[in-house]
From Swiss-Prot:
Location of the protein in the cell: Cytoplasm
Cross-referenced Pfam families: SeqA, SeqA_N
Subunit-level organization: Homodimer. Polymerizes to form helical filaments.
Function as written in the Swiss-Prot or TrEMBL entry: Negative regulator of replication initiation, which contributes to regulation of DNA replication and ensures that replication initiation occurs exactly once per chromosome per cell cycle. Binds to pairs of hemimethylated GATC sequences in the oriC region, thus preventing assembly of replication proteins and re-initiation at newly replicated origins. Repression is relieved when the region becomes fully methylated.
Stated name of the protein: Negative modulator of initiation of replication
Encoding gene (name): seqA
Family in the record: Belongs to the SeqA family.
Region (Interaction with DNA), start-end ranges: 86-87
Transmembrane segments: none
Length: 179
């Protein structure tokens, strides 16, 4: 497998042409260009595909109730608006969450999909889990997040993070709408 860099516009175009969860960029491009798609990627499975739902796959261990932090006031609206694209806003909000309570942030490592790792403490861990993860560091936190998810999935992941911080539902909706 070779890696190429594409600009944001091409990335969004390719991502918008996704027809099924887990479809790789190579599969999308092959389909769009009319090339033969690898048989193993498109074969029907005996069992229906399970869609990843962060926070629903694993039951969390019983732990102390997270202390409430008003994250809404921690997010600078002007800086958020200046963030580049959905990925930039996603990273900006995650960094604000980290800065609000760094000692609590390690909880995000528990947020995983069925066969998907969303957070890690190294870029290599995310790339090992998925070659197409496109990991980005969350500010200077030392935590990394997968960014090759669509905006809806980013919102779902962020919702789970905010739940771990004890954020109230109204604030969660308000914050995640900003991605």
């Amino acid at each position: 497998m070779k890696y190429i860099e594409v600009d944001e516009e091409l990335y969004r175009l390719i991502a918008s042409k996704t027809e099924r969860i887990g479809e790789s960029a190579s599969e999308i491009l092959r389909r769009l260009l009319g090339l033969e798609v690898e048989a193993s990627a498109t074969q029907e499975k005996d069992e229906p595909e399970v869609i990843s739902q962060p926070g629903l796959e694993e039951t969390a261990d019983v732990e102390d109730k997270p202390r409430f932090i008003d994250l809404h006031s921690s997010i600078n609206k002007e800086e958020l608006a200046a963030a580049k694209g959905a990925v930039g806003r996603f990273l900006f909000i995650l960094e604000a969450v980290y800065l609000a309570s760094p000692e609590q942030f390690a909880q995000v490592l528990k947020i995983k999909g069925r066969d998907r790792l969303y957070f890690a403490t190294s870029k290599q861990s995310l790339l090992k889990a998925s070659k197409s993860a496109n990991p980005k560091e969350i500010g200077q936190s030392g935590y990394w997040v997968t960014t090759n998810n669509n905006t809806a999935k980013k919102r779902t992941i962020l919702t789970e993070v905010l739940h771990q911080y004890g954020t109230v539902e109204a604030q969660i909706e308000s914050i995640t709408r900003n991605i």
